[in-house]
Regions:
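Bacterial N-terminal signal peptides that target proteins for export
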Residues: 1-10
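Classic N-terminal secretory signal peptides
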Residues: 9-18
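Sec/Tat signal peptide C-region and signal peptidase I cleavage site
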Residues: 20-26
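N-terminal segment of the mature soluble domain
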Residues: 31-77
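Short secondary-structure boundary motifs at beta->alpha junctions and helix caps
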Residues: 44, 121-151
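A short, structured loop/turn motif at beta-sheet edges
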Residues: 63-71, 111-121
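Surface-exposed short loop/turn segments
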Residues: 75-113
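Short, low-complexity, Pro/Ser/Thr/Gly-rich segments in the mature regions of secreted, periplasmic
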Residues: 151-160
Length: 161
């Protein structure tokens, strides 16, 4: 049996592992008692996907901080945009967005540190009651597009980034 060395695969893996990150900025994200969150999907794999995508988004935001700054986020509660509508004939329920009392909301604690010194910290209830009325740079196919835009706005406003 011959073993083939694929330099393009190795190079691609290395670029993906090292590229796109700010070596000096770090983000740590934790989800405190997610089983008690106001609005999370029912299926365990969907819950994992939501938390993974939010974690990755906070990491992208943390990478925008100046080199040497570290962002710590503790997610305390999540209420996703829209409401779940159970579907009897399909394997997945659907999320319906009406723009009424179904806006996205995330409660979190945050801290930005540099060299052991706390630069900013607090607890925030991040929400967007008019989430359907704003321009959204995330495509219609993007998962959690309203939550991501809302977090982008919070990050720009609170952390001036």
């Amino acid at each position: 049996m011959k073993k083939f060395f694929q330099p393009s695969l190795v190079l691609t893996t290395l670029v993906l592992a090292l590229g796109g990150t700010n070596a000096g900025a770090a983000a740590t994200v934790t989800f405190t008692q997610p089983e008690g969150y106001v609005d999370m999907p029912f299926a365990p794999w969907e819950k994992e996907r939501v938390m993974k995508e939010l974690k990755e988004h906070f990491e992208k935001l943390g990478a925008k901080l100046p080199q040497g700054h570290d962002l710590t986020v503790e997610v305390l509660d999540i209420d996703l945009a829209g409401r779940i509508e159970p579907q009897l004939h399909f394997s997945q329920d659907i999320r319906v967005l009406k723009g009424r009392a179904d806006w996205p909301m995330i409660v979190l604690r945050y801290r930005v540190e540099s060299q052991g010194k706390v630069l900013a910290s607090g607890e925030a209830r991040v929400d967007d009651k008019s989430y359907l009325d704003h321009f959204n740079r995330y495509s219609a196919n993007e998962s959690l597009r309203y939550e991501k835009r809302m977090l982008d706005d919070w990050f720009k406003t609170v952390l001036n980034q």
